[in-house]
Amino acid sequence: MSSSSPAGTARTIRKKVYDASLKAMFTLRPERIHGIIADGLGVLQMATPVNRAMGRVIGVNDPVLSQEVFGVTFPRPLGLAAGFDKNATAADTWTALGFGYAELGTVTASPQAGNPTPRLFRLPADRAILNRMGFNNAGAADVADNLRRRKSRDVIGINIGKTKVVPAEQAVDDYRRSASLLGDLADYLVVNVSSPNTPGLRDLQAVESLRPILAAVQESTSVPVLVKIAPDLSDEDVDAVADLAVELGLAGIVATNTTISREGLVTPAHEVAEMGAGGISGPPVAERALEVLRRLHARVGDQLVLIGVGGISTPEQAWERIAAGATLLQGYTGFIYGGPDWIRDIHLGLAEQVKAHGLSNISEAVGSGLPWKDSAV
């Protein structure tokens, strides 16, 4: 896109405005900014004409990007990752910002406040975020009420997790309760057993613990069920979860959540140590998230839908995930640092690659191993 074209000029203006806004926002505590943005998007959700106008300006509506996945039509492959819209207060706004869909939550069966603040930190040198939010949310019943008030039919998934005070031996019933309350209000459900911020949660990724949870969720809803895994799993455990997902007939796997690793960071180690425990999202998780995705695709082929998430910053990286086996993509940290044009740039880049390779739809590129063609941009 030429910077002198009307579209290029508009993009330049949007970028300058967003960069200036980001600089101002970064003077505030991260969770305060999150609250301001979430409240603003909640208000915007009620302004349907504004939403539609935004969607026309920012959204990339190219038919080569539209796919039918587990019986649901996704107009664009990049969606909002779970963690931003925890209570579904802006569910009708995300596609207006350019996303193809949104994964809401994480939602727990009972409301909970999450971990003590501060619990959200920026690592600007890494364009990353560290969080230990702890599934703060209004609870499944309240979120269900919010979803019933939706006006649009934009595609949404709901990410469900374990209530912190519920002991591990009661986790099955806890997940079942959330699935029963929320399943019929979503296009798909994701079972989150991979957040590092709820004590003992990641232990539920072990197959013997995970099997009854997934089976209970499947029994509680008719919508597709996926499981979200951590990048910190061993390769053997990744294989075991993949095999279980195929055995149970799950719709897919979301790969991956945040990492507890602190390796390879640009941010000084003492600064990261002062932030404390938590999972890191953004570029530091990208390499391992891609490794896990490739391993999953090699293991399951097209038996499961794979959703690639973790450190996707550029159109090239997005294409790499598609070529490695991801049917859909998600992002959160890239959106924080890049704004709506990050979403638009990724979708434009993906559409250009589809055409450059002589394909008719992005689904043909999934798992293809096709390289990025520089001549396409």
Swiss-Prot record:
Reactions performed catalytically: (S)-dihydroorotate + a quinone = orotate + a quinol
Molecular-function GO terms, alphabetical: dihydroorotate dehydrogenase (quinone) activity
Domain of life the protein comes from: Bacteria
Compartments, as annotated in UniProt: Cell membrane
EC numbers: 1.3.5.2
Main location: membrane
Summary of subunit composition and partner proteins: Monomer.
Pfam families xref list: DHO_dh
Active-site residues, record numbering mapped to chain: S195
Name of the featured protein: Dihydroorotate dehydrogenase (quinone)
Residues that, per the record, bind substrate: K86, N131, R132, M133, G134, F135, N192, N197, N257, T258
PROSITE patterns for this protein: DHODEHASE_1, DHODEHASE_2
The protein's role, per its UniProt record: Catalyzes the conversion of dihydroorotate to orotate with quinone as electron acceptor.
Zinc-finger found in the keyword field: no
Membrane topology, record value: Peripheral membrane protein
Keywords: Cell membrane, Flavoprotein, FMN, Membrane, Oxidoreductase, Pyrimidine biosynthesis
Principal EC category: oxidoreductase
The keyword Flavoprotein belongs to this UniProt entry's keyword annotation: yes
An example Gene Ontology biological process: 'de novo' pyrimidine nucleobase biosynthetic process
Membrane-spanning ranges: none
Associated pathway: Pyrimidine metabolism; UMP biosynthesis via de novo pathway; orotate from (S)-dihydroorotate (quinone route): step 1/1
Co-factor binding comment: Binds 1 FMN per subunit.
A GO CC term assigned to this protein in UniProt: cytoplasm
Assigned protein family: Belongs to the dihydroorotate dehydrogenase family. Type 2 subfamily.
Residue positions binding FMN: A82, G83, F84, D85, K86, T106, N159, N192, K228, T256, G282, G311, Y332, T333
